[in-house]
Amino acid sequence: MSLLAQLDQKIAANGGLIVSCQPVPDSPLDKPEIVAAMALAAEQAGAVAIRIEGVANLQATRAVVSVPIIGIVKRDLEDSPVRITAYIEDVDALAQAGADIIAIDGTDRPRPVPVETLLARIHHHGLLAMTDCSTPEDGLACQKLGAEIIGTTLSGYTTPETPEEPDLALVKTLSEAGCRVIAEGRYNTPAQAADAMRHGAWAVTVGSAITRLEHICQWYNTAMKKAVL
């Protein structure tokens, strides 16, 4: 059975939650063994897949979980706004570390390596390719190039203003166009994740609301301070 077919079964049985285990950089939680522990806890709680950033984190996680891992490498480049899995060597390193799916930036922006080249390299390793997109045009272009999974990950992050709510319209548009969509980006409540599934998402990735303790504390602190002003 193919990995996509296996995931279809898991999603039907468990609901389609993917947990992104990416601690705040330099946080006390930003250690491979802690990332792996969070991933294992998520798997035991019913997550159908895990999203991991960084080769060391992926290696540690691969050793303890059996669910599929979506791997990425983030870089801050001087000559490109693209941050997610920008280089061939990133793809190779993630494949060697045990990723099942490799996600890349799929936006139409200046980049060191073309999207189609990165997709070809992912497929060279026999792995599934996911593209993190920001618009319908991004997603449809990446689907035509052969990406098996389209993520709404970068919606709201390629423009000056980032909205508070997730982009359900993008999920619906891409799903209706025939894309296998992972909804991602600002899904901070179970209700929002459920809405994404109703709008046609294949699965939903949740990160900050589950694995970024600093963000969760900030949400509570902000709300509670407002309550006593």
From Swiss-Prot:
Coiled coil: none annotated. It catalyses: an N-acyl-D-glucosamine 6-phosphate = an N-acyl-D-mannosamine 6-phosphate. Transmembrane segments: none annotated. GO terms for cellular component: cytosol. The keyword Isomerase applies. Keywords: Carbohydrate metabolism, Isomerase. CDD domains: NanE. Pathway: Amino-sugar metabolism; N-acetylneuraminate degradation; D-fructose 6-phosphate from N-acetylneuraminate: step 3/5. It is an enzyme of class 5 (isomerase). It comes from the Bacteria. NCBIfam families: PRK01130.1 (NF002231). This is Putative N-acetylmannosamine-6-phosphate 2-epimerase. It comes from Shigella flexneri. The gene is nanE.
